[in-house]
Amino acid sequence: MLNDTLALAQMLIARRSPTPFDNGCQEILIDRLEKMGFDIERIRCGEVDNLWARRGTEAPLICFAGHTDVVPTGPLEKWESSPFDPVTRNGRLYGRGAADMKGSIAAFITSIEAFVAEHPDHNGSIALLITSDEEGIAVDGTVRVVEVLKARNELIDYCIVGEPTSVDKLGDMIKNGRRGSLSGTLTVKGIQGHIAYPHLAKNPIHLAAPAIAELANTEWDEGNEYFPPTTWQISNINGGTGATNVIPGEVTVLFNFRFSTASTIESLKARVHGILDRHNLEYDLQWENSGKPYLTPRGDLVDAVNAAIHTVTGIEPELSTSGGTSDGRFIADICPQVVELGPRNATIHKINEYVEVSDLDQLPRIYQLTMESLLLRK
């Protein structure tokens, strides 16, 4: 299985697919999925290619989810080899997307091929959900496929997202949830004027500063057994004309919450507005919700993945909800059990990204054992 997984990963990496472009990656997958009897549904949204492929019609349905788009390469001269010319050296496969996440997608395919070959009449169903819009704004990708499935009441029982979750060893960490992400664009209004005549102006930066300090020092919640406390962070502050003798007329603050299940979108919004109002600011605040938090407690899927990892690697994985958002936040809307499991993540989005060849050897077996646990039960 290793040589096949490695070869498929190389084929996918060789397809230059900066977000939101797939550049033929999904057609490579479709060719192999059709040979296994999968029904293929291409769902194109704008420039984004999405794939929903399913084998079987019965429950339970286990889905493997991933993305074929990759982040920009950065300066090409800093790569030891071309990012889209996959090269294996010193036990590592180098190329953009090797770890995030074309290696996982290759492992999806070869694990399913092995499982179907051994168990052609298995119970339940297997699906693949692949998008080319995960690394970008993620508005025409997985979320659109989920909308299609939800509209026809096609629900998923278990989902494994192939995000590179491992840290030091393959399988040492799996994500059984993620925090939500809520962003705000705050514009505090003042009165522009000459900096030598502050009594004739209102400096919005000075007016906003106490409220910003209060927001930065607020304890939003204490978290819970699954999530750390909610955080509030400023990403950008912009005010002024660029001149040194002009008090600006307004200041704009971009901020973001990463929040746990201990808080809600509504409660966070209300508290922010309460603080701003208490400081008597004239302001405009626009919100953008990028996803609610989700959590998969211990149960069939977590137990099956844990057992598979232990069988293949001999280690006990850590359950974690740390890190950024993933497409799991969309899938959780139609699937009660979602986990993320993939190769080591030390070089994702970096120059000279790579995946350990040993991870490509073991990961398909972990996925296959998970399918056996969930689909072969009496």
Curated annotation (Swiss-Prot):
Active site per the UniProt annotation: 69, 134 (proton acceptor)
Record key words, sorted: Amino-acid biosynthesis, Cobalt, Diaminopimelate biosynthesis, Hydrolase, Lysine biosynthesis, Metal-binding, Zinc
Binding note for cofactor: Binds 2 Zn(2+) or Co(2+) ions per subunit.
Name this protein carries in UniProt: Succinyl-diaminopimelate desuccinylase
Pfam family, one: Peptidase_M20
Pathway(s) this gene product operates in, as recorded in its UniProt entry: Amino-acid biosynthesis; L-lysine biosynthesis via DAP pathway; LL-2,6-diaminopimelate from (S)-tetrahydrodipicolinate (succinylase route): step 3/3
Entry binding sites for Zn(2+) 1: 67, 100, 163
Annotated organism of origin: Nitrosospira multiformis (strain ATCC 25196 / NCIMB 11849 / C 71)
HAMAP family: DapE
Residues reported to bind Zn(2+) 2: 100, 135, 349
Catalytic activity: N-succinyl-(2S,6S)-2,6-diaminopimelate + H2O = (2S,6S)-2,6-diaminopimelate + succinate
Cofactor(s) needed for function: Zn(2+); Co(2+)
GO-annotated molecular function: acetylornithine deacetylase activity; cobalt ion binding; succinyl-diaminopimelate desuccinylase activity; zinc ion binding
